[in-house]
């Protein structure tokens, strides 16, 4: 049985195994608190994320289970990787991952980025997305604060499964809205991996200009700002809108022509403008893919087709439509944690573990 130690961080009890020391707060998110710590086993600095009240509701339990499954499955240089996971005696869940030091949001607010950094960061984002999309996974909430960077400019995408659009907690997130694809924002249709390409395009534009491209005050204002730059969506896209209210709103907007992006990004390379134009397209099916983007001239300095891997197998989403009670999610989560630690246990043993707590 692991020995646990307690510390108070931001008024919250952090209860971790004695393997970790020197806890320092890094940040508070919507669903968890993140601290840096020293892993005494590897002598490396790590990030420890406490998931707040993971078993308080079936929705939160399912969200936590989804994030755990994704972290276990996704293994790529440009995706955050799991190095440990445990449930504390107080029944909080802790994910331990690499510590990268900063994120793209902090970098963008501190200084303008030089061309070679923009290219290298975008290359790594698209390299990570190629892998993630090949696994049948859509991030759904890609934004600068979800893109971690270290002092060597190594980049990793994080917070997978954290923001399902159906989660009511996410609807008010201004930072999320800036990067959200039109088909999600206006609930046009079932969305797919293309939403991440739109978000990456918004991030690319922000790296080029140093400020958010579409800083909408709300969804209506957001869509209006998008059409000011990209013009009115084509009729074949408008006709896919299922919601009558949304359709009425879009048709009520004044007709606008798409503006040449070179007029807005006057200092950007023509190849950067060309790639950005291929990413910010209303019709999801006409957006460039991550694989295609990696072959684009703008990313040529870093492109290596022999070192841009895809997932060995698709992620298993079979649990995603399940409507289960908290205790069942808890047992499933405990089973996943035991599997991660290569511990064999029967379903009965797992159930007895929880009934005994």
Curated annotation (Swiss-Prot):
Localization per record: Cytoplasm; Nucleus
Q: Which family does it belong to?
A: Belongs to the protein kinase superfamily. Ser/Thr protein kinase family. MAP kinase subfamily. HOG1 sub-subfamily.
Its activity is regulated as follows: Activated by tyrosine and threonine phosphorylation.
Q: Which keywords belong to this entry?
A: Activator, ATP-binding, Cytoplasm, Kinase, Nucleotide-binding, Nucleus, Phosphoprotein, Serine/threonine-protein kinase, Transcription, Transcription regulation, Transferase
Q: Which residues carry this modification: Phosphotyrosine?
A: 173
Q: What is known of its domains?
A: The TXY motif contains the threonine and tyrosine residues whose phosphorylation activates the MAP kinases.
Q: Which Pfam families match?
A: Pkinase
Look up and give the organism this protein is from: Colletotrichum orbiculare (strain 104-T / ATCC 96160 / CBS 514.97 / LARS 414 / MAFF 240422)
GO cellular component labels: cytoplasm; nucleus
Primary role: Proline-directed serine/threonine-protein kinase involved in a signal transduction pathway that is activated by changes in the osmolarity of the extracellular environment. Controls osmotic regulation of transcription of target genes.
Q: What is this protein called?
A: Mitogen-activated protein kinase HOG1
- Reactions the enzyme catalyzes: L-seryl-[protein] + ATP = O-phospho-L-seryl-[protein] + ADP + H(+); L-threonyl-[protein] + ATP = O-phospho-L-threonyl-[protein] + ADP + H(+)
Chain positions found as Phosphothreonine: 171
Q: What is its EC number?
A: 2.7.11.24
Co-factor requirement: Mg(2+)
Protein kinase domain location, by residue?
Answer: 20-299
Molecular function terms from GO:
ATP binding; MAP kinase activity; protein serine kinase activity
GO BP: any one term: stress-activated MAPK cascade
Q: How is it modified after translation?
A: Dually phosphorylated on Thr-171 and Tyr-173, which activates the enzyme.
Chief localization: cytoplasm
Task: Give the residue interval(s) assigned to the motif TXY.
Answer: 171-173
The UniProt annotation places ATP binding at 26-34, 49
Q: Which residues form the active site?
A: 141
Superkingdom is Eukaryota
- InterPro entries in alphabetical order: Kinase-like_dom_sf, MAP_kinase, MAP_kinase_CS, MAPK_p38-like, MAPK_Sty1/Hog1, Prot_kinase_dom, Protein_kinase_ATP_BS, Ser/Thr_kinase_AS
């Amino acid at each position: 049985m692991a020995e646990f130690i307690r510390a108070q961080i931001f008024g919250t009890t952090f209860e971790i195994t004695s393997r970790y020391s020197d806890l320092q707060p890094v940040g508070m998110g919507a669903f968890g608190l993140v601290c840096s710590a020293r892993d005494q086993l590897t002598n490396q600095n790590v990030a420890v994320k406490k998931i707040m009240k993971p078993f308080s509701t079936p929705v939160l339990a399912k969200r936590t289970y989804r994030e755990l499954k994704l972290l276990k499955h996704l293994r790529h240089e440009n995706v955050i990787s799991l190095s440990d996971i445990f449930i504390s005696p107080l029944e909080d869940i802790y994910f331990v991952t690499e510590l990268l030091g900063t994120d793209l949001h902090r970098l963008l607010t501190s200084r303008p980025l030089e061309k070679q950094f923009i290219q290298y960061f975008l290359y790594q984002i698209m390299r990570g997305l190629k892998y993630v999309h090949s696994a049948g996974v859509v991030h759904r909430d890609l934004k600068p604060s979800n893109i971690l960077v270290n002092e060597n400019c190594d980049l990793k995408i994080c917070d997978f499964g954290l923001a399902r659009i159906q989660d009511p907690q996410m609807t008010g997130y201004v930072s999320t809205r800036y990067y959200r694809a039109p088909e999600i924002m206006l609930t046009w249709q079932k969305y797919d991996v293309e939403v991440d390409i739109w978000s990456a395009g918004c991030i690319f534009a922000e790296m080029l200009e140093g400020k958010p491209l579409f800083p909408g005050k709300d969804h209506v204002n957001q869509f209006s700002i998008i059409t000011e730059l990209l013009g009115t969506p084509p009729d074949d896209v408008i006709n896919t809108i299922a919601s009558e209210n949304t359709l009425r709103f879009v048709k009520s907007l004044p007709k606008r022509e798409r503006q040449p992006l070179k007029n807005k990004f006057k200092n950007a390379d023509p190849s950067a403008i060309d790639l950005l134009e291929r990413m910010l397209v209303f019709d999801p099916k006409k957006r460039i893919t991550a694989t295609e983007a990696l072959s684009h001239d703008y990313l040529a300095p870093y492109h290596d087709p022999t070192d841009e891997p895809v997932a060995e197998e698709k992620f298993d989403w079979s649990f995603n439509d399940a409507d289960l009670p908290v205790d069942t999610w808890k047992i499933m989560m405990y089973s996943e944690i035991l599997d991660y630690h290569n511990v064999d246990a029967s379903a009965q043993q797992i159930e007895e573990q929880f009934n005994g707590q």
